[in-house]
């Protein structure tokens, strides 16, 4: 099942939000030890098991949502079209994206769109791609790591001293001021 790891995390969050035990949720579906592995991303359940667990929690899995790649490209390039792209591709589908393989993408893009720049909870990190983790580190103010990870996945040009213009362009004024002074001396960016 595509996005099975993130499905396990979403199952765990929904189960804990309802204050359900693992044994109670998985009764008649799978063993509690197997559910534990699913929730940790250590086991890839069949689509049927995932669907049964999600259904019991009242959630509907969207297995093949429309790609959010245009939003990622607009965000990472610093394009002024990012807001319009987000409003077209993410906003109308927030509910279905929240229970899909693109749940982390939708939350990270929302953090930049809403200009709140709030990082995802740390429990999401083992399930993030390199690109997602690079943005997560930027949201956490861990700029050097964000640049290193972003360079590895070609999110932006490699720089040992400062992030690229695309990353800087997405920052709110408060986060921009948190950056090390040397990074804020990027040509064309007022300090």
Where are the model-predicted features located?
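"A position-specific structural signal for the A-helix of alpha-solenoid helical repeats
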Residues: 69-73, 102-109, 113, 128-136, ...
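Short alpha-helical DNA-recognition segment
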Residues: 18-37
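DNA major-groove recognition helix of helix-turn-helix/homeodomain DNA-binding modules
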Residues: 46-63
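A short, Lys/Arg-rich alpha-helix, primarily the initiator
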Residues: 1-17
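Amphipathic alpha-helical segments of tetratricopeptide repeats
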Residues: 89-95, 122, 151-153, 178-189
């Amino acid at each position: 099942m595509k996005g099975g790891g993130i499905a396990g995390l979403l199952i765990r969050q929904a189960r804990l939000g309802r204050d359900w035990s693992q044994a109670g949720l998985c009764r008649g579906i799978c063993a509690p030890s197997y559910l534990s592995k699913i929730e940790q991303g250590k086991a890839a359940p069949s689509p049927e098991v995932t669907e049964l667990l999600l259904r019991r929690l009242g959630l509907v899995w969207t297995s093949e949502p429309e790609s959010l790649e245009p939003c990622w490209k607009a965000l990472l390039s610093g394009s002024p079209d990012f807001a319009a792209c987000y409003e077209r591709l993410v906003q109308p589908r927030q509910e279905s994206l929240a229970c899909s393989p693109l749940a982390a993408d939708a939350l990270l893009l929302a953090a930049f769109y809403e200009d709140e720049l709030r990082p995802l909870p740390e429990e999401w990190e083992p399930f993030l791609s390199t690109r997602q983790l690079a943005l997560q580190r930027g949201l956490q103010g861990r700029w050097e790591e964000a640049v290193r990870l972003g360079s590895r996945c070609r999110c932006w040009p490699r720089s040992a001293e400062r992030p690229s213009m695309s990353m800087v362009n997405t920052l709110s004024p408060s986060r921009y001021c948190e950056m090390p002074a040397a990074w804020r001396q990027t040509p064309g960016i007022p300090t």
